[in-house]
């Protein structure tokens, strides 16, 4: 079995990330979704995510197999939600954006590893509420988040001229004790960088 792990994306990952994103854009278009069909996200989006250390890559056998952005600051488009409400509207939350699995690895369960690791990183930052949004035609993403017990909370609008409405999901984890001591030293470098 190949080594599979999550790490922060680096500038040298940008070409691999963009290949994955371009493949995802084509798949979304093929599946009838207007999501990501207006030039977003682009290379500058991911360069910014890498610069702010919010983009993560799932590595499988030394290759970038998946990418996602874990934003720990409030998402402006989540201020206004219709057809529902956030369960924890005033609590801190992390937003998971731009989730994509390489076409070379689709169907291998890597989305579970990616989400599990992102939730762990968020929890290590003291976050227990996570949000994500996706287009109503993006059935694959809906399936992934619903399998992780994200609950559909309503509709938000993003800056997309084609179709701005997105389904808004939220996961509220129980109260956990703050991590104060780590026995497995192989994780310490990652934790120290958070």
Where are these regions (language model features)?
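Conserved N-terminal entry element of GNAT/NAT acetyltransferase domains
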Residues: 1-12, 175-194
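Conserved acyl-donor/pantetheine-binding loop and adjacent beta-alpha core of acyl/acetyltransferases
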Residues: 69-100, 106
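Conserved GNAT-fold acetyl-CoA-binding loop/helix
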Residues: 25-45
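Conserved acetyl-CoA-binding loop-helix of GNAT-fold acetyltransferases
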Residues: 101, 107-120, 143, 147
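Conserved beta-strand-loop-alpha-helix junction that forms the acyl-donor binding cleft
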Residues: 106, 132-142, 160
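Conserved active-site alpha-helix within GNAT-family acetyltransferase domains
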Residues: 112, 124, 136-154
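Conserved GNAT acetyl-CoA-binding A-motif
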Residues: 115, 122-134
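Conserved beta-hairpin
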Residues: 54-70
């Amino acid at each position: 079995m190949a080594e599979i792990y999550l790490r922060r994306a680096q500038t040298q990952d940008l070409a691999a990330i963009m290949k994955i994103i371009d493949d995802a854009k084509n798949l979304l278009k093929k599946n009838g979704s207007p999501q990501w069909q207006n030039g977003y996200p682009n290379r500058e989006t991911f360069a910014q995510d890498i610069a702010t250390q919010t983009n993560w890559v799932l590595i499988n056998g030394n290759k970038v197999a998946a990418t996602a952005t874990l934003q720990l600051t409030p998402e402006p488009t989540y201020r206004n939600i219709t057809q529902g409400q956030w369960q924890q509207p005033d609590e801190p939350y992390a937003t998971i954006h731009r989730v994509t699995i390489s076409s070379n690895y689709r169907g291998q369960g890597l989305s579970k590893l990616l989400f599990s690791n992102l939730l762990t990183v968020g929890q290590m930052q003291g976050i227990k509420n996570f949000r994500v949004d996706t287009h109503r035609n993006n059935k694959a993403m809906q399936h992934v988040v619903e399998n992780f017990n994200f609950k559909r909370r309503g509709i938000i609008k993003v800056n997309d001229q084609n179709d701005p409405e997105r389904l808004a999901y939220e996961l509220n984890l129980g109260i956990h004790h703050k991590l104060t001591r780590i026995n497995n030293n192989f994780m310490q470098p990652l934790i120290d960088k958070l």
